[in-house]
């Protein structure tokens, strides 16, 4: 299960949200996004403080023991909210789409030189999770451009 080491409240304008129930955490450089187990937004930050928020959340919330896909940057995605994974014919990037029909994560073809190998590992892992196995760790460096 997702492990929250402590309650985590994030200020959102004049209110706060409890981010402790987030099961997915992604950061792409421009924004930080937290989603719950139903792929609903818990928090979204595209301010200059988004990287700081990402680092703070990474320390407080850990991926689900069985369904957590740990990303290269320390973020994670709950496999149960992934609806599709493919290499975009338009951009050449690997795209993971959520149940909400929005991109969860985009892996850039410039950063990852072996997207064909990487997508195979991710697809196999998703199929195995569907059959009751734990999501394996991915050796991201094996697929990166040198």
Tell where the protein language model's regions lie, with residue ranges.
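Eukaryotic intrinsically disordered, low-complexity regulatory linkers and tails enriched in Ser/Thr/Pro
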Residues: 1-146
